[in-house]
C-alpha cells in the first residue's frame, strides 16, 4: 500500500494514485485538497486523506532538511488545523482519516519528536471532539544515522518506538512512520576514479569521474560523506590536502573541501 506525500501533487498523479488504490494522500494545502476533491468526484471515487500539519518545531537539523518550522513550505499551520479539517470534511470525494506530521531529516535527538507528537496527540483529541474520525497518524521519519564520528549515538529504533508509544500510543490510532535514511542511508557506496590531480594557486584538486549529479547532497548543502581510497596508500609517503571535485562545469560540484582537514590523499 502506498502513501502519497509531497507539496506539488499534480492532477495526473492524483488520477494515477486513485486508479491504483492508494492507501492515502498526505494533503499539504487547501488548493491541493480542493483539486483532489475535484479529481475524486470526476472519477467516482473517494480519496482517503490525512492532512499534514506544521507544528513549528525546530528539528535541530540542517536548515535545508528541516520541514516542520513555520517558515518551511510543508503542511498546514497547526493553529489553522481545525479550520482546514472542517473544510476537508465538507468537500465531496474526500474521506479524512488522520493527521500527518514530518519535522525534518537526520534528527539526532528525540526531544523535537516529543514536542511534535505531543501536539499531534492534543490535536487528535480536539479533532475527535469536533466530530472527525481520526484513525491514522503518519508521524513522518528522519531518524538520524552516523556519518562522520563513529562515537555519535543517534537515537535507536527502540528508543524512538518507546517515545511514540508514550506520546501517541494511548490514542488507538494506526501508526505510520517513514524510517527511510535509517534503513538505507548506509546501504550504498559511490565508487569514483581520479581522472586528474591538479595544483591550483592556493589548493590542490582531485578531479573525479563522479559528479554532483551522482551524489548531490555535498554540493547542495554541504552534507558530509566519508571519502576513503579504494587502495590504501603506502606507508611513509608525503601527504597533502585536496579538494575532491567532479567534472561538472560549476564550482559547486564539490564532494569535500579543505575544511575536512582529515581528508589527506597521497601525492603522485
Model feature map: region roles:
Residues 1-136, 145:
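Active-site-proximal beta-alpha core segment in soluble small-molecule metabolic enzymes
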Residues 57-61, 134-151, 176-177, 181-188, ...:
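Flexible glycine/acidic-rich beta-alpha junction loops that bind and position SAM and/or redox cofactors
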Residues 109-116, 146-159, 185-196, 259-260:
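Short glycine/threonine-rich loop-to-helix capping motif typified by GTGT followed
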Residues 116-172:
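Acidic, glycine-rich loop-and-beta core segments that form the ion-binding/anion-interacting portion
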Residues 163, 171-263:
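Charged (often Lys/Glu-rich) extended helix/loop segments that serve as interaction or gating elements
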Residues 264-268:
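A short, hydrophobic C-terminal helix/tail in secreted or cell-surface proteins
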